[in-house]
Design a protein with these regions (language model features):
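Low-complexity, acidic/Ser/Thr- and charged residue-rich accessory regions of DNA metabolism proteins
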Residues: 141-149, 205, 244-267, 271, ...
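C-terminal accessory/binding modules appended to enzymatic or scaffolding proteins
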Residues: 11-12, 306-308, 470-504, 622-660, ...
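Duplex nucleic acid-engaging cores and interfaces of nucleic-acid transaction enzymes
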Residues: 45-51, 58, 62-72, 76-315, ...
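Long, charge-rich intrinsically disordered scaffolds of nucleic-acid metabolism proteins
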Residues: 95, 395, 401, 406-476, ...
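Long, charged amphipathic helices and adjacent flexible linkers at domain junctions
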Residues: 278-296, 411, 446-477, 586-632
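A glycine-rich phosphate-binding loop feature that marks nucleotide/adenosyl-phosphate handling sites
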Residues: 176-182, 316-320, 374-379, 397-404, ...
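Accessory alpha-helical DNA-binding modules that contact the DNA backbone or grooves
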Residues: 29-30, 45-147, 475-614, 621, ...
């Protein structure tokens, strides 16, 4: 049944879901399934396999909750066959909790107290709605704890109110109406005007619950968490209460007065707060999911940023008072030299710094400069460009997360004898060479490409970001003989322990000559090898296929292709025209389908190639260094640094990034900023607004005003 529910929810064929679930339960990873098991999944891509896994996890969790509910009700002796069937047939968490509510262990409530005082029979009489002498009946319930008939009736109404609040139909009716027509409203907490000025847009704001945007709701939530705002759900209480009256108060009821009072109290005191909490939690989850989706997509783009490649680099972590930390790196990213120069105020040793940088570039045959884009970054870039070093590229590199890495255990382990400034400069240089290999060492949340990342569900955020890192690492593949344990950790089927074992084995035994040698690594068994091998590359090894995305389990197919063509595997790999003549369907059999054969041929064409784009040179406007240099209407080059649901932030070479609102991204309607821009994209923007008080810069990419 689980697979059928998933297929229905995702709109994917049952056979595809069944194949995917079987592989997931067998311990296969998402990258492995989507890349090497297309016959089993009907060629589902990574996102679809991930969606199946997410639904499977949710339904597994729901199944566990159902067992808890069944057990609890069973212990109360109230589990009927009909109730068991209803619970077992339930596949929605909200519905399950509604069924469970009347049986759920409670704290002491007004209704609990009323029952303890023996008022349940009176409540039953009122709910029967056919007795005209309730006031006289109530006198029989007068005791020391219930001194008057009025108090007896009030207690009985408390019991009725709780029953109404636990009625599935009633809760569903209120939930549907409030979700469809309700609005989320934020208002200022009295006396917080100055403290909460940044939330001024939300001091008295209302948005339809169905359509409130992720960033707007999360901003409200953050304001609430900081004690500046209060949030509530506005709903038509009178109309909803009237609907409940129609459900519970019969026409011609003899106890109408008390029933209507109990229903109104039930809605105001019990149902509304409960449904309001539920709806706000659902809105929070929806907003979290959208914010996490945006963060994950930004992270994916950043991790797959174009690498400069294995080049000799001079990296600079700029600064004013503390100077610029300079490091020289070889083409493998190893630290060769470090020093500090002081070209900027207050020291102003410009000529000395220029000579030092020129000398280092010559001594270490530098092919590029990597300059951090933080404090003093533009000034340092100007200095380096002014050196006039022919054939040496100059690149600005994002510093986001570099300070986190430099103070981390990973950095201390690699550079125990150097301080955080040296480690930070090394990270900047390596990030230019290969962003992916360097960024995997940093907690993804510290990279700075999120939207309200500290306000969303942290466990869900971390799980999603880890999935993205795994996806990117396995998409690119890694060289088994140069990869750090940090990047190996994310390879399909490995994890930290096996990554450390691989690095230790490599250090003790030298480079791996082929993929099969991985099986000699301690604790790396057949299952881990199956999951990992296709994503690990052996460059210049014994078997040329080891430097491709072809899985070892499919080598025999390539060998057949070569044999059929009358050539060796090496000759087949070297001759693109020969490969063009291969007919994939000839190699399809009961074990291997057309998708796998097609992927094999594609992998042979791309053997040894990096799937990432080529790095492009870029420079900011040399006349713009601060907000004071900006004028409305001026056109500037920029780099997209962050993408949100409401637009894109662009670095224009000053301390503060500008915002291109979604409405200003193009001369047409834009549904999502990601449809128009990507991280690191070089764009041309026009300044449309400068707010020096709130430190905001408005930009536009529209050509027609």
């Amino acid at each position: 049944m689980t697979e059928q529910i998933i297929a229905q929810r995702l709109g994917i064929a049952l056979r595809q879901v069944q194949g995917t679930v079987r592989l997931l339960r067998d311990g296969a990873t998402i990258p492995f399934i989507s890349r090497y098991r297309k016959e089993a999944t009907g060629s589902l891509d990574e996102l679809q396999v991930g969606a199946v896994k997410e639904q499977l996890d949710k339904l597994t969790e729901l199944e566990a909750r159902k067992q808890t509910v069944l057990s609890t009700i069973g212990e109360q002796g109230k589990l009927t066959d009909e109730l068991r069937k209803r619970i077992e047939a339930c596949w929605e968490a909200v519905e399950l909790e509604d069924i469970y509510l009347p049986y759920k262990p409670k704290r002491r409530t007004r209704a609990t107290v009323a029952r303890e005082r023996g008022l349940e029979p009176l409540a039953n009489s009122i709910m029967a709605q056919n007795s005209h002498d309730i006031a006289r009946q109530a006198q029989r319930f007068v005791t020391a704890d219930v001194p008057t008939p009025e108090e007896a009736i009030a207690g009985a109404c408390d019991i009725i109110a709780e029953r109404v609040s636990e009625d599935e139909r009633a809760r569903n009716s209120v939930r549907r109406t409030a979700a469809r027509e309700g609005a989320v409203h934020s208002r200022l907490v009295k006396g917080k005007e100055q403290e909460g000025v940044k939330y001024s847009d939300y001091f008295d704001a209302t948005s339809p619950l169905r359509t409130v945007s992720s960033h707007r709701f999360l901003a409200m939530r953050r304001g609430m968490d900081e004690g500046v705002l209060k949030i509530s759900v506005e709903m038509d209480a009178d109309r909803i209460t009237e609907g409940l009256r129609r459900q519970f108060v019969r026409h011609g009821s003899a106890t109408r007065e008390w029933m209507e009072a109990a229903v109104a109290d039930s809605f105001k005191r019990l149902i509304r707060p409960s449904i309001e909490t539920e709806l706000l939690a659902a809105a929070k989850e929806k907003a979290d999911d959208e914010a996490i989706r945006v963060f994950a997509e930004n992270l994916r783009q950043l991790l797959l940023s174009a690498p400069l490649g294995q080049k000799r680099i001079i990296a600079v972590d700029p600064g004013f008072r503390t100077g610029c930390k300079v490091v020289a790196l070889d083409s493998q990213g190893n630290l060769l030299h470090n020093t500090t120069v002081y070209p900027h105020p207050p020291q102003n040793r410009y000529a000395e710094a220029a000579e030092t940088l020129r000398s280092l570039a010559a001594r270490y045959k530098a092919e590029a400069f990597a300059i951090g884009d933080g404090t003093a970054g533009r000034e340092t870039e100007q200095l380096v460009r002014g050196l006039g070093l022919e054939g040496v590229g100059v690149f600005m590199v994002s510093e986001d997360g570099a300070s986190v890495y430099s103070a981390s255990a990973a950095a201390r382990e690699e550079f125990p004898d150097h301080d955080v400034t040296v480690r930070g400069a090394v990270s900047i240089g390596r990030r230019l060479m290969d962003p992916l290999s360097e960024l995997v060492k940093i907690d993804p949340k510290s990279i700075g490409v999120g939207q309200y990342q500290h306000s969303v569900d942290q466990s869900k955020l971390r799980a999603r970001l880890v999935t993205v890192v795994e996806s990117c690492v396995n998409k690119v593949g890694v060289n088994i003989n140069t990869a750090s344990k940090h990047i190996l950790t994310y390879i399909s089927g490995l994890g930290l322990a096996l990554a450390e074992n691989i690095v230790a084995y490599r250090a003790a035994n030298g480079d791996f000559k082929d993929r099969k040698s991985l099986l000699k690594v301690p604790r790396l068994g057949a299952k881990a090898y199956e999951q990992a091998a296709g994503f690990l590359r052996v460059v210049g090894g014994r078997n040329p296929l080891d430097n491709s995305a072809v899985h070892p389990e499919s080598y025999h197919i390539v060998e057949r292709m070569a044999a059929d063509a009358g050539v060796t595997v090496e000759q087949l790999l070297a001759d693109k025209e020969l490969r063009k003549g291969i007919k994939p369907e000839r190699y399809v059999d009961a074990e291997v389908g057309l998708p796998t054969v097609t992927d094999i041929l594609e992998a042979l064409d791309k053997r040894g190639l990096d799937p990432r784009e080529q790095l492009q040179a870029f420079s900011f406007d040399p006349d713009v260094h601060s907000v004071a240099d900006l004028r409305e209407g001026m056109t500037l080059p920029g780099i997209v640094t962050n993408i949100t649901a409401f637009g894109a932030f662009v670095d224009i070479g000053i301390k503060q990034d500008g915002l291109v609102h979604i409405s200003q991204l193009a001369d047409r309607y834009v549904a999502s900023p990601a449809d128009v821009v990507h991280l690191g994209q070089h764009v041309e923007v026009r300044v449309t607004g400068i707010d020096t008080v709130r430190n905001r810069i408005a930009l536009s990419m529209r050509k027609n005003g």
